[in-house]
């Protein structure tokens, strides 16, 4: 092979190694970083360890990437937590506002779905409690509740109040467990000091049952009260 032919051969090899076809054959060892992957990893961290566990350094380590690569998707830690919060809002069923259920039944069923989502991810509730802000799923949730109440002939101002009331009630129930707040040590409840708490040490083992029953009791009372107001609105119109 002449010197000219040798240079031509090497140039051909160099060009082919940089061609789209050759590059397409290469595969990254790990999945490409994505917004969804970051949010899912952050949600797992929040669920397991709380809001304080989330940092760009920790997320980068969990994802096996460099810290700066996260900034291609989120500018701050707060943006990541907002996205995690919205991913939880997206788990709430809204179909009851679209399938013909009356306003009371729809609110009841929606409240159960909403509480279930928050119960599965209680550590993110403080972020959700800030309000929907610009979060798409949170705004869809607010829009669905308000729209359904107005469609049922609630005045707009009262429809707004109902949305706020339901949010306060559901979020409040998700912030902690009443029954879980008692210890299973009978000696902690000396009858001399707490004459009516002789069985309080038994509450913790019935935590889920007691909390579910309390939520249903409160929800029924709340909806009963709204139903009375609704009749007054109908008579006045």
Predicted regions: what is each one?
Residues 94-137, 156, 166:
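Hydrophobic alpha-helical connector segments
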Residues 36-44, 48-49, 79-95, 105-113, ...:
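Alpha-helical structural segments
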Residues 1-58, 62, 75-82, 213:
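Basic, helix-initiating cap at the start of DNA-binding domains
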Residues 64-74:
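Short hydrophobic/aromatic patch on the recognition helix
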Residues 2-23, 179-237:
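C-terminal peripheral helix-coil segments that are non-catalytic and often amphipathic
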């Amino acid at each position: 092979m002449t010197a000219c032919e040798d240079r031509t051969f090497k140039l051909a090899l160099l060009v082919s190694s940089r061609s789209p076809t050759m590059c397409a054959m290469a595969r990254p060892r790990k999945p490409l970083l994505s917004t969804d992957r970051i949010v899912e990893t952050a949600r797992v961290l929040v669920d397991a360890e709380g809001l304080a566990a989330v940092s760009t350094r920790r997320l980068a380590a969990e994802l096996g990437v460099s810290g700066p690569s996260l900034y291609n998707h989120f500018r701050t830690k707060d943006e990541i937590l907002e996205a995690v919060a919205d991913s939880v809002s997206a788990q709430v069923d809204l179909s009851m506002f679209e399938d013909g259920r009356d306003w009371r039944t729809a609110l009841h069923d929606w409240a159960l779905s909403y509480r279930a989502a928050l119960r599965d991810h209680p550590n993110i509730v403080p972020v959700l409690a800030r309000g929907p802000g610009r979060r798409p799923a949170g705004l869809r949730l607010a829009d669905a509740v308000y729209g359904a109440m107005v469609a049922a002939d609630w005045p707009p101002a009262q429809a707004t109040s109902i949305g706020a009331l339901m949010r306060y009630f559901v979020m409040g129930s998700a912030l902690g467990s009443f029954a879980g707040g008692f210890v299973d040590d009978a000696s902690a409840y000396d009858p001399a000091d707490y004459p009516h708490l002789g069985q309080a040490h038994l509450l913790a083992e019935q935590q889920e049952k007691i909390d579910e029953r309390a939520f249903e009791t409160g929800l029924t009372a709340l909806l009963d009260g709204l139903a009375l107001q609704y009749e007054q609105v109908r008579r006045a119109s």
